[in-house]
Amino acid sequence: MQTEAQEEGDKLVLHYHDVVIRQSVSCNLSRSLIALIDCLNEQDLDTLAPGQWLNDTMIEFHMEFLERTFVPKDAKYLFLRPGMVHLITYAEGDVMQLEPALPPQMDQYEAIFIPINDGNPHKAYSGTHWSIMVYVRAVSSFYYYDTLKFNNLRDGELSSKRIQPLLKLKKPTQFIPSSTPQQINGSDCGVSVISIIDYTLHQLLKSRDKKDQVHYDKIMILKSKDMSTPKQVRDNINGMIKRLQQRCKTSCSSSSSSSTTTSSSSLNK
């Protein structure tokens, strides 16, 4: 399916699972690198520059990368995409009616990472600030992190209440506003969210084999030293994209050589 941006000639940079980054040459990667839900264009990539506000698609790309390369297959961790969180939070009526459109068996996940945005309830992609909430099933708790003085606290609380029925819990959940290192400008909320996702994911994975002994209120505490700097996050994502792009080029080259060889063999028969 083409988007308006594709029709206008944006370049394909990379095709990675549920995310496409456009540049001049497309390529066929192995099955493990193919899927399409959303598109990253050059304007999206520009949000990685210092001082720029990270948009939805870059956060989705990072989540996709973690799912495919970092999280063990037997770990039941869910990364809800920003658009899905918006739908759950603001759709009218009973949230259970949305189940067919949501990831199956949400009640079975050990942890759910939930990006929060202060956007207009009636307009997607309209917010100005990101925060992050992590649901931990073992303690029925939503840990809420905000790098701008709990700017999105009410949005986080609303999202947690809307998500609760989908989790089919037998006991009430806790919403825990967690102390969070604060950003020093108005543009680093998105990269801070990525840093927090990385750290809390690491903490949860590290504790998987000793669940009965884990004090989640301790391991989910976040301090400044635990977070990557905004520059580190931006550089890491840029580097990630370049490495995947190189894999794409290598795959393209191999596919092209294979195709040429096959064609030549056919002509010689």
Please name every model-derived segment.
Residues M1-S131, Y135-S141:
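Cysteine protease catalytic domains with a Cys-His-Asp triad
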Residues C252-L267:
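Long, low-complexity, serine/threonine-rich intrinsically disordered regions
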Residues Q2, F150, S259-T261:
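Intrinsically disordered/low-complexity terminal segments and short unstructured peptides
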Residues A91-T250, L267:
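Cysteine protease-like catalytic core of ubiquitin/ubiquitin-like
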